[in-house]
Amino acid sequence: LVEAGRSPNIEILTNARLETLEGEPGQFTAGVHQEPRFIDEDKCTACGTCTMYCPRPIVDLYNERLSISRAPHIDYVQAIPSSYYIDPKVCLRINYETCNLCAQTCTAQAIDFSQKPRKLSLDIGAVVLALGFGRIDQSVLEKYGYGRFLDVVTSMEFERLTCASGPTEGHIVRLSDKKPLKKIAFLQCVGSRDETCGNGYCSTVCCMYAIKEASVAKEHNADLDIALFFMDVRSQGKGFDAARERAEDKYGLRVIRARIPRVDQVDGQLALTWTTDYGKSCSELFDMVVLSEGLNAPKDAKAIAEIAGIELNHYGFCKTSVDSPLVASRDGVYVAGAFQGPKDIPESVTQASGVAAMASELLSEVRNTRTVTISYPEEDKT
């Protein structure tokens, strides 16, 4: 991403959305709406002073609402461009004109409340839709106690808890009392392979990311007792099954074939009850329950499909054919990554490479007609 941001032949439009797409392959015209950042990205040094002085707290969406940020902020350290922006929905200056602390304290004079939305018209040859995936609806999570019990968390929230740059600086603790964990349960296939929520497909990534998160947790605390409740183990990918077996042996992860119907709270702990393959009823208490969320279609998939003139399948992902999995239903429009269907990062990167080759073939006649070459002054050898 950093390399792409530095390339003179790649233009990154942030805070932007596609509004229209007209024309034919090789000669598309895209109408783009770009929202203002209210901070000049050329002047901003990302020092963080504006965030420090801003009196308006907001939930940090990047940290899965587990920490607090401010109206002027940067989503994460490696964000492109490496500059802050102001959330217009919560900024006191934009909504009520009652505050100007960020502008008064910015030594780079980067705050610019005069910025307005822009309408852009772009001449393009091909379109690649890489919208990513959407989140499972919260109503699916609620039957497991999510939202009622603080120690029932999603896999994304647990990922941030294990991260050194996360809200707890990598210390895995109970959210209810901030005490260290002793027992963790992972529940698989939450929002996947479940016709009651309309998602009958396997999300393909949940088994392996649960194994990874459990392994990371054991590296943080070797005394943790971790149980993973699977309906079926589907570690899809080259060498993934062997990697799963190594993790189970190395860290002593317990793999239990059962589908948990609900989560109860007993004396401050979380109670799980299940039936084994042999009909035996079991129950156990845990300090934290992690819900391994499946991958949903992007929430704006329908709107983008109407604008781009493409079709979606009955699950809301981009409709493609078996023999052309990277080609959408409109000529010149391609798809890559989880918008085509649930998949992991390596497969998404592979698809992106394939799409780049197909787009390059489509535009072969005009190749290198708009490229820019960086020139450097000659070295002074005297």
Give the residues covered by each predicted segment.
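Residues forming the flavin
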Residues: 1-382
